[in-house]
C-alpha cells in the first residue's frame, strides 16, 4: 500500500520507476519505453503493465499497485514482449527489489521532475495516436503533445488541445 496526496499520475510514475529500475539493475540503458497511461514496451512490444487500486481509509487515500512483467511467455503469445532473454542482466529478484526500493523512496520523498523524465521515455511523444475512451466506442485522433502534472494526456486534434484523463492510446504499428 502506498499513500500519496496526488494519486492522479501514480501509474505513470510507477511505470517510470520500473523503467529506471531496469536500467539500474542491468547497468545499461534497456530502452523500456513508456506508453500512456500504464504500459512499458521494449522493441515496440508490451513487457509490463501497471494497475492501481485505491481505497479511502479515513482521511487517507491508500493505493495497491499491481505490476505484471512478462518474463517467460509461450511462443504462441509472441505479439507480447518478453524480458526473459534479458534474465542474465535483469535477474527477476534484483529487478523486483530495485522496483520496490524505488517505489518506497518515491512514497517517502516524491519525484520532483517526474513529468519531464516520463516524457523523455514516452514512445509516442509528438506522434499521431488514437485516444480511446474507457467504453472503447469513442475515440479522438490527434498528436500526443505530452502530459500535464496530473498525468492527463495532452492531445492536439485538428481544432484544439484536449486534456484526456482516462482511457488508452493506440499507436499505428504497435498495438
Language model segments and positions:
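Glycine- and Gly-Pro-enriched alpha-helical subdomains that act as flexible
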Residues: 35-36, 41-42
Amino acid at each position: 500500500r502506498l499513500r500519496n496526496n496526488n494519486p492522479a499520475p501514480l501509474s505513470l510514475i510507477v511505470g517510470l520507476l520500473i523503467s529506471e529500475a531496469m536500467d539500474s539493475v542491468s547497468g545499461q540503458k534497456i530502452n523500456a519505453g513508456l506508453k500512456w497511461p500504464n504500459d512499458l514496451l521494449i522493441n515496440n512490444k508490451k513487457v509490463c503493465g501497471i494497475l492501481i487500486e485505491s481505497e479511502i481509509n479515513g482521511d487517507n487515500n491508500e493505493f495497491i499497485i499491481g505490476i505484471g512483467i512478462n518474463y517467460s511467455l509461450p511462443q504462441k503469445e509472441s505479439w507480447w514482449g518478453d524480458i526473459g532473454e534479458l534474465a542474465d542482466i535483469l535477474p527477476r529478484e534484483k529487478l523486483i527489489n530495485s522496483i520496490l526500493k524505488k517505489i518506497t523512496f518515491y512514497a517517502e520523498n516524491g519525484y520532483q521532475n517526474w513529468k519531464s523524465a516520463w516524457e523523455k521515455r514516452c514512445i509516442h511523444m509528438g506522434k499521431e495516436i488514437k485516444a480511446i475512451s474507457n467504453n472503447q466506442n469513442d475515440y479522438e485522433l490527434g498528436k500526443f503533445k505530452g502530459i500535464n502534472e496530473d498525468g492527463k494526456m495532452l492531445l492536439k486534434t485538428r481544432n484544439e488541445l484536449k486534456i484526456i484523463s482516462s482511457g488508452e492510446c493506440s499507436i499505428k504499428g504497435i498495438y
